Amino acid sequence: VLKAISCGREPTDVELASVSLPEGTVWIDLLDPTSEEIGWTERNLGVRIPSRHDLSEIELSSRLAKEGENMYLSAPVIGAATIEHADLTPAGFIVTPHVLITVRFETLPTFDIVAQRLEHDKTLTTSMAVFVALMEAIVDVVPTYLSTWLLP
Protein backbone atom coordinates (compact mmCIF):
# COMPACT_ATOMS: atom_id res chain seq x y z
CA VAL A 1 0.00 0.00 0.00
CA LEU A 2 1.36 3.41 -1.01
CA LYS A 3 -0.16 6.31 0.93
CA ALA A 4 0.46 10.04 0.57
CA ILE A 5 0.01 11.93 3.82
CA SER A 6 -0.36 15.70 4.00
CA CYS A 7 -0.77 18.11 6.86
CA GLY A 8 -4.46 18.80 7.46
CA ARG A 9 -5.78 16.01 5.20
CA GLU A 10 -6.65 12.34 5.44
CA PRO A 11 -4.07 9.93 3.97
CA THR A 12 -4.77 9.07 0.33
CA ASP A 13 -3.75 6.18 -1.89
CA VAL A 14 -1.25 7.18 -4.58
CA GLU A 15 -2.35 6.42 -8.12
CA LEU A 16 0.50 4.53 -9.78
CA ALA A 17 -0.58 5.94 -13.16
CA SER A 18 0.24 9.43 -11.88
CA VAL A 19 3.75 10.87 -11.94
CA SER A 20 3.23 13.32 -9.11
CA LEU A 21 2.19 13.35 -5.49
CA PRO A 22 -0.91 15.07 -4.18
CA GLU A 23 -0.19 18.71 -3.34
CA GLY A 24 1.24 19.25 0.13
CA THR A 25 2.44 15.67 0.65
CA VAL A 26 5.06 15.51 3.41
CA TRP A 27 5.03 11.76 4.07
CA ILE A 28 4.88 8.71 1.80
CA ASP A 29 4.11 5.53 3.74
CA LEU A 30 4.88 2.22 2.04
CA LEU A 31 3.15 -0.61 3.92
CA ASP A 32 4.24 -4.04 2.65
CA PRO A 33 4.88 -2.45 -0.76
CA THR A 34 4.53 -4.25 -4.07
CA SER A 35 7.32 -4.13 -6.64
CA GLU A 36 5.17 -1.67 -8.63
CA GLU A 37 4.84 0.67 -5.62
CA ILE A 38 8.58 0.46 -4.95
CA GLY A 39 9.34 1.17 -8.61
CA TRP A 40 6.95 4.15 -8.69
CA THR A 41 8.53 5.64 -5.57
CA GLU A 42 12.09 5.16 -6.81
CA ARG A 43 11.33 6.61 -10.26
CA ASN A 44 9.27 9.58 -9.16
CA LEU A 45 11.11 10.55 -5.98
CA GLY A 46 14.67 9.64 -6.97
CA VAL A 47 15.35 7.44 -3.95
CA ARG A 48 16.46 3.86 -3.38
CA ILE A 49 13.88 1.87 -1.42
CA PRO A 50 15.62 -0.63 0.87
CA SER A 51 14.39 -4.24 0.93
CA ARG A 52 13.10 -6.00 4.02
CA HIS A 53 16.46 -7.80 4.17
CA ASP A 54 18.33 -4.46 4.08
CA LEU A 55 16.15 -3.08 6.87
CA SER A 56 16.70 -6.18 9.00
CA GLU A 57 20.50 -5.82 9.07
CA ILE A 58 21.71 -5.74 12.66
CA GLU A 59 25.08 -4.04 12.20
CA LEU A 60 25.08 -0.45 13.39
CA SER A 61 26.85 0.60 10.20
CA SER A 62 23.80 -0.62 8.25
CA ARG A 63 21.31 1.49 10.22
CA LEU A 64 22.24 4.97 9.03
CA ALA A 65 23.44 6.23 5.65
CA LYS A 66 23.45 9.45 3.66
CA GLU A 67 23.07 9.50 -0.12
CA GLY A 68 23.17 12.99 -1.56
CA GLU A 69 20.57 15.05 0.31
CA ASN A 70 18.72 11.97 1.54
CA MET A 71 19.21 10.35 4.95
CA TYR A 72 18.42 6.62 5.24
CA LEU A 73 17.70 5.05 8.64
CA SER A 74 16.43 1.68 9.75
CA ALA A 75 15.26 0.48 13.13
CA PRO A 76 13.37 -2.37 14.72
CA VAL A 77 9.97 -1.08 15.86
CA ILE A 78 7.46 -2.66 18.25
CA GLY A 79 4.65 -4.13 16.20
CA ALA A 80 2.11 -6.51 17.68
CA ALA A 81 2.44 -6.55 21.45
CA THR A 82 0.82 -8.16 24.43
CA ILE A 83 1.53 -7.98 28.15
CA GLU A 84 3.94 -10.92 27.80
CA HIS A 85 5.53 -10.34 24.41
CA ALA A 86 6.21 -7.80 21.68
CA ASP A 87 7.14 -8.47 18.08
CA LEU A 88 9.83 -6.30 16.57
CA THR A 89 9.54 -5.53 12.90
CA PRO A 90 11.97 -3.64 10.66
CA ALA A 91 11.08 -0.15 9.53
CA GLY A 92 12.91 2.17 7.17
CA PHE A 93 12.95 5.94 7.06
CA ILE A 94 14.17 8.06 4.16
CA VAL A 95 14.28 11.74 5.04
CA THR A 96 14.49 13.86 1.89
CA PRO A 97 14.39 17.66 1.76
CA HIS A 98 10.71 17.57 0.74
CA VAL A 99 9.12 14.31 1.86
CA LEU A 100 9.59 11.57 4.44
CA ILE A 101 9.33 8.05 3.01
CA THR A 102 8.68 5.16 5.37
CA VAL A 103 8.91 1.47 4.53
CA ARG A 104 7.31 -1.12 6.79
CA PHE A 105 5.91 -4.60 6.46
CA GLU A 106 3.34 -4.68 9.24
CA THR A 107 0.68 -2.36 10.57
CA LEU A 108 2.29 -0.28 13.31
CA PRO A 109 0.05 1.61 15.74
CA THR A 110 2.65 4.35 16.21
CA PHE A 111 2.53 5.15 12.48
CA ASP A 112 -1.26 5.28 12.54
CA ILE A 113 -1.17 7.65 15.53
CA VAL A 114 1.14 10.07 13.71
CA ALA A 115 -0.90 9.84 10.48
CA GLN A 116 -4.02 10.80 12.46
CA ARG A 117 -2.11 13.60 14.15
CA LEU A 118 -1.17 15.05 10.76
CA GLU A 119 -4.85 15.46 9.91
CA HIS A 120 -5.19 18.03 12.72
CA ASP A 121 -1.71 19.30 13.63
CA LYS A 122 -0.79 22.17 11.32
CA THR A 123 2.84 22.25 12.55
CA LEU A 124 3.93 19.02 10.84
CA THR A 125 4.68 20.58 7.48
CA THR A 126 8.19 19.26 6.74
CA SER A 127 9.70 15.82 6.26
CA MET A 128 11.93 16.33 9.30
CA ALA A 129 9.00 17.39 11.52
CA VAL A 130 7.09 14.24 10.57
CA PHE A 131 10.21 12.11 11.13
CA VAL A 132 10.67 13.58 14.61
CA ALA A 133 6.97 12.99 15.40
CA LEU A 134 7.33 9.34 14.35
CA MET A 135 10.48 8.91 16.46
CA GLU A 136 8.69 10.45 19.46
CA ALA A 137 5.74 8.08 19.03
CA ILE A 138 8.03 5.05 18.68
CA VAL A 139 10.07 5.98 21.75
CA ASP A 140 6.95 6.84 23.79
CA VAL A 141 5.60 3.26 23.65
CA VAL A 142 8.82 1.61 24.86
CA PRO A 143 8.49 2.56 28.58
CA THR A 144 4.96 1.14 28.66
CA TYR A 145 6.18 -2.29 27.60
CA LEU A 146 9.39 -2.15 29.62
CA SER A 147 7.52 -1.36 32.83
CA THR A 148 5.07 -4.19 32.13
CA TRP A 149 7.80 -6.73 31.45
CA LEU A 150 10.34 -5.65 34.05
CA LEU A 151 8.18 -4.79 37.05
CA PRO A 152 6.40 -7.57 38.96
Please identify what each model-predicted range represents:
Residues 1-152:
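Peripheral, non-transmembrane regulatory/ligand-interaction domains of membrane transport proteins
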